[in-house]
C-alpha cells in the first residue's frame, strides 16, 4: 500500500488482512526491564511516514521486496519537562517482504536503524480475530497468554503491560481468521 502497510489475502479462506506492518512509536520512561508509558504521550504511526518500495530479487520461485520507511520521531524524552523532545530524527525501518511459490505465508524480516532514546517501537498486525488468548514463543516452549489485561491489574504494584516478551512469533486466531 502507499502508506507502507501490507494487505494480504489468504487464498484458502479468502480472508483479507489490511494495515499489516504498521509501526507505532511512543515514549518509554520505564527502566531497562519494564515499559513505562508517559502521561499525555502521542503515539506516532508509520502510516504517515515516507515509504519507498524496491524489488530486491525476483525469480520463478520467490520474490523479495524492500519497504523502507523513515519515521520522524523525537530524539529523546525530557524527564524534567515530562515530555518528548521537540527535536526529531529519521528512524529508518527496512522490511524485506518475501513471497515464495506455494507457500501459505508471507515472510517479513525487519531491521531498524535506531539513533533515538527513551521510546518503544512495535509493529502492528491487526488480525480481526475475536480471540481471548494468543500463542507466543518462549525459550524451549510455546505459551498461551491472555490477549487483554486482567480487570484488577490496576491494584498491583508492578502492573502488567499489554505487550509480552517474544522473539520469533505470536499467533492469534479464532474460528474464521488468524495470523502468526
Residue ranges and their predicted role:
Residues 114-116:
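Short, acidic/polar linear motifs in exposed loop/turn regions
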Residues 1-111, 123, 142-153:
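Catalytic and substrate-binding regions of extracellular carbohydrate-active enzymes
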Residues 119-121:
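Active-site-proximal binding-pocket segments
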Residues 125-180:
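Polysaccharide-binding surfaces and accessory modules of carbohydrate-active proteins
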Amino acid at each position: 500500500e502507499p502508506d507502507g502497510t501490507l494487505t494480504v489475502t489468504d487464498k484458502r479462506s479468502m480472508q483479507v488482512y489490511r494495515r499489516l506492518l504498521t509501526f507505532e512509536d511512543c515514549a518509554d520512561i520505564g527502566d531497562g526491564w519494564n515499559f513505562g508509558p508517559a502521561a499525555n504521550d502521542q503515539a506516532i504511526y508509520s502510516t504517515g511516514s515516507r515509504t519507498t518500495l524496491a524489488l530486491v530479487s525476483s525469480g520463478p520461485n520467490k520474490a523479495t521486496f524492500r519497504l523502507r520507511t523513515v519515521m520522524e520521531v523525537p530524539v529523546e524524552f525530557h524527564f524534567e519537562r515530562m515530555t518528548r523532545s521537540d527535536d526529531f530524527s529519521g528512524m529508518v525501518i527496512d522490511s524485506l517482504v518475501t513471497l515464495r511459490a506455494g507457500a501459505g505465508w508471507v515472510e517479513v524480516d525487519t531491521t531498524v536503524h535506531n539513533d533515538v532514546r527513551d521510546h518503544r517501537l512495535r509493529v502492528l498486525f491487526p488480525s480481526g480475530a475475536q480471540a481471548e488468548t494468543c500463542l507466543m514463543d518462549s525459550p524451549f516452549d510455546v505459551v498461551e497468554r491472555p490477549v487483554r489485561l486482567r480487570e484488577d491489574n490496576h491494584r498491583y504494584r508492578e502492573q502488567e503491560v499489554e505487550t509480552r516478551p517474544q522473539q520469533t512469533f505470536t499467533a492469534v486466531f479464532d474460528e474464521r481468521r488468524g495470523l502468526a
